[in-house]
Amino acid sequence: MGRRYFGTDGIRGTVGEAPITPDFVLRLGYAAGKVLAGTADVAAGARPTVLIGKDTRVSGYMLEAALEAGFSAAGVDVMLAGPMPTPGVAYLTRALRLSAGVVISASHNPYQDNGIKFFSADGNKLPDETEAAIEAWLDKPLECASSDRLGKARRLEDAAGRYIEFCKSTFPAAYDLRGLKLVIDCAHGAAYQIAPHVFHELGADVIPIGVAPNGFNINDGVGATAPDALVRAVRANHADLGIALDGDADRLQVVDSTGRLYNGDELLYVLVKDRIATAGKVDGAVGTLMTNLAVEVALQREGVPFVRAAVGDRYVLEQLRERGWQLGAEGSGHILSLDRHSTGDGIVSALLVLAALKRSDRTLAQMLDGVTLFPQKLINVRMKPGADWKGSASIRAAIDAAEGALAGSGRVLIRASGTEPVLRVMVEAQQAADATRHAEAIADAVRMATS
């Protein structure tokens, strides 16, 4: 039986609508707490402890309180990190030997949305069977622990400082960032008090933008999903590079001094090239079904095996672990380097890119010389929840027409979002006009069939 609440990246939705309501989130905290309590060494008097971090959405206060109450009712202690990037929660959970970590965030979504995602004790996303166990507990009545067994809550002192030091530790000690002018766009999100300090303390001249959250402006015209603001700031300040994070700082986009934008596909290639130069070889790299074909071809040219996972960083992570590889990425900017961190981390990924540039004494454009991305057109089509797009003859006909016209010179990918009622239509072709024309034709068919 499929999961009812957990999607590809936890539980997410519009605040005030099921399941992102305070009563559900309280029960979710209780259910997760009972699952954790079942794995703790209760006989030895152990009490599970979880860490809760959040981004800057106004709803985070409400959901944090609900989660805290649910965990306490289950007899689980809580540590509160306050605003903290998703990868920061993963790191602190592992470093402090806690039972689990919880992030309250909807990542790159607007402030009206929010979500809950969990990390296991080792800083990894929960396995499917644990999520299923939590869902099973949601069906049971909430039976509050006795007063002497209620969980306690306290704030984690200097959570930001601990994570800042971890990020800096991933940058080679032989290098620093002196002489570099960097624009850092924090998307008015979880990294607003962290990312500028990381790069500044490594020596960079930092120009921060997107660092004035008010509860309502997260990802609004700034950050990795709206890089135009970063491009303008880089040009206006004559900066060497711009770094854009999203609301929970697990994804990255980079802009060079000319205003050229580099996505996760290109940055993966840069990191692979750097590893080849420093380690002599790379066993393999993982992308997704959306990864640009040009990057796959370029990696093959370097003798690096390449595997496409389903879209979603959890699936990239699964493929990396299965093969014992270290480097993987999505074009959206989720970059994984498993010898540095257990999950995607925008700040750490940016430091890896900067280290590669320092070691090679080359620019991003120079490192990507000879890699020309195939034009891609991506259209997100909102549809009614539960719409049967797979059974639509008109959508199938539009896809067949596009694939027939491209005839081996491009590809079509249609997939449903795992976090919202959206169908993503992607067409890749040798000519941008062809990609746009075919993507729009398919998107029109989707709108007609699912609206």
Swiss-Prot record:
According to the UniProt record, list the residues that bear Phosphoserine: S107
Keyword Secreted among record annotations: no
Q: Which GO terms describe its biological process?
A: carbohydrate metabolic process; peptidoglycan biosynthetic process; UDP-N-acetylglucosamine biosynthetic process
Q: How is it modified after translation?
A: Activated by phosphorylation.
Q: Supply one GO CC term from the record.
A: cytosol
Q: How, per the record, is the cofactor bound?
A: Binds 1 Mg(2+) ion per subunit.
Q: Where is the active site?
A: S107
Where Mg(2+) is bound, by residue?
S107, D246, D248, D250
UniProt KW Metal-binding keyword: yes
What are the GO MF terms of this UniProt record? magnesium ion binding; phosphoglucosamine mutase activity; phosphomannomutase activity
Annotated EC: 5.4.2.10
Q: Which SUPFAM superfamilies match?
A: Phosphoglucomutase, C-terminal domain (SSF55957), Phosphoglucomutase, first 3 domains (SSF53738)
Q: Which residues cross the membrane?
A: none
Write out the similarity annotation.
Belongs to the phosphohexose mutase family.
Q: What is this protein called?
A: Phosphoglucosamine mutase
Which species is this UniProt entry from? Burkholderia ambifaria (strain ATCC BAA-244 / DSM 16087 / CCUG 44356 / LMG 19182 / AMMD)
Gene name per UniProt: glmM
